[in-house]
Amino acid sequence: LGPKRVVSLTVYDGFLYATSYDGGRVYRFDGETWTDCGQIGDDTQTYAFTRYEGRLHVSMWPSARVYRFEDVGRWTDIGKLGQELEVMGMMVHNGRFIGGTLPLAEVHAYDGDGKWTLWQRLDHTPDVKYRRAWTMAEHAGEVFCATLPSGRVWAARHGRQVSWDHSLPSGWHHIAAVKTASRLTLHVNSKQVSESSGFDAAEWNLDSAAPLRLGTGMNGPFNGQLANLQIHRRALAASEIEAFSAKRPE
């Protein structure tokens, strides 16, 4: 990349991608050479990456816009976050695409069709030029955001979810997700590995006109194989989960 300052790196669809403070461009590496993926809008800096609905997205300065990667030299503008100047940390939390900003350290959520909604401003430090919702991570069903200059870490939760923050080793594994009237649980090879906080199911409307998609999600496709998929109309008991777990694919 020559003298350009690299900001963020990510791997997507077999390539290594890089953003830069020098020019509103993204570069990708195929193992031998770097390719310029084109000028993005009228911006002068590219910042963060995230994958949403299986597609690579990048954030910008000074427009505070997010662009979706279509192909080399082709980017689609999916909207501006408020009246901000830069989008910093980005991630997908429980299906919602969110981004943190500068100079007011706001967090916005993507509603689709180029529209973003303000969730909350996180840093109110007085008498400074820039406040940043800088970087994000997800853990134990919550999203965390670090802010500057206040030096605080904020946590939030959108809906309810369970996760197991470990990588699965190679081979077949039985995964069971169970919803009761007050809790979600996750089971790996018949062992319960995660449990949500309590809730009242009557307060949640889970009706949806969206099609059921298997093996893919809001982040992207599942990297592996699926077999013996079952959907039950009731919560399974631990003994039932154990029995299903014992039946591995041939």
Indicate residue ranges for each PLM-predicted region.
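Extracellular glycan-associated modules
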Residues: 10, 50, 91, 115, ...
